[in-house]
From Swiss-Prot:
Protein name: PITH domain-containing protein P35G2.02
One term under GO cellular component: nucleus
Protein family: Belongs to the PITHD1 family.
SUPFAM superfamilies for the chain: Galactose-binding domain-like
Subcellular localization(s) per the UniProt record: Cytoplasm; Nucleus
Entry keyword set: Cytoplasm, Nucleus
UniProt xrefs under Pfam families: PITH (PF06201)
Main localization (coarse): cytoplasm
PANTHER family per the UniProt record, alphabetical: AD039 HT014 THIOREDOXIN FAMILY TRP26 (PTHR12175), PITH DOMAIN-CONTAINING PROTEIN 1 (PTHR12175:SF1)
Record domain PITH: where: 13-189
UniProt superkingdom: Eukaryota
Species this chain originates from: Schizosaccharomyces pombe (strain 972 / ATCC 24843)
InterPro entries, alphabetized: Galactose-bd-like_sf, PITH1-like, PITH_dom, PITH_dom_sf
Keyword S-adenosyl-L-methionine: no
Length: 207
């Protein structure tokens, strides 16, 4: 297995003119991203964009039955995560927090409430403009990543939809030598089958 490298230099077909030089954008298996509770099928994978399209609102994702969105993001190798960037809107569609669950292939809305998040991050209650927030993670907790679950929700249990315009991941990456293991997810879940997660179980932060 070759040594770690930064995907913008070695993987990306369209290198950045500006922005993070340690993006994991091209190291994500974007065609295999699954988003649970998305209003428009396959819209969730489109918010994982190259840096130069981070303010392009042609593609956004909106939640369907309630405020929750769960992204299941597979990598084309072993990734180490340094930070996550999220762009949201300054209105009622903004999520209040998100939680990270590395290397889990068994999570959906039935099971995630029973699992301790590795880290949980909160967005500011008020902000102006469509802002990109960057959240550094505890890198030691996100090494040898083959997949990452990102769970967005609101603290008030609102039924207003959540919208996200951009998600970016920063870190380093070692590609697989052989073919990656393919995991089959429930691509089109029925929201009625997935009760809302107890907010008290999700809102824990670790610093």
């Amino acid at each position: 297995m070759s040594g770690p490298h930064h995907c913008s230099a070695d993987c990306d077909e369209h290198p950045f003119e500006s922005g993070p030089n340690d993006t994991l954008y091209s190291c994500i298996r974007k065609e295999s991203i699954v988003t649970l509770n998305e209003a428009v099928p396959d819209s969730g994978k489109l918010v994982f964009k190259p840096w130069d399209l981070r303010y392009d609102d042609t593609d956004i994702v909106e939640s369907d039955a309630d405020d929750q969105l769960l992204f299941q993001v597979p990598f084309a190798g072993a990734a180490t995560l340094k930070s996550i960037l999220v762009r949201i809107f300054p209105n009622e569609t903004a999520p209040h927090s998100f939680s990270l669950f590395p290397n889990r292939t068994d999570l959906d809305f039935d099971t995630i409430g029973d699992v301790q998040a590795t880290e949980t991050f909160e967005f500011p209650l008020t902000f102006e403009g469509s802002h990109i927030f960057e959240f550094p993670v505890k890198t030691r907790l996100y090494q040898n990543l083959q997949n990452l679950n990102i769970f967005f929700t609101k603290s008030d249990g609102s039924d207003d939809p959540t919208q996200i315009a951009y998600i970016g991941l920063r870190g380093s990456f070692v590609p697989f030598k052989g073919d990656p293991v393919v995991t089959i997810y429930e691509a089109t879940p029925r929201p009625s089958d997935h009760p809302k997660v107890n907010q008290e179980e999700v809102f824990r932060s670790y610093y």
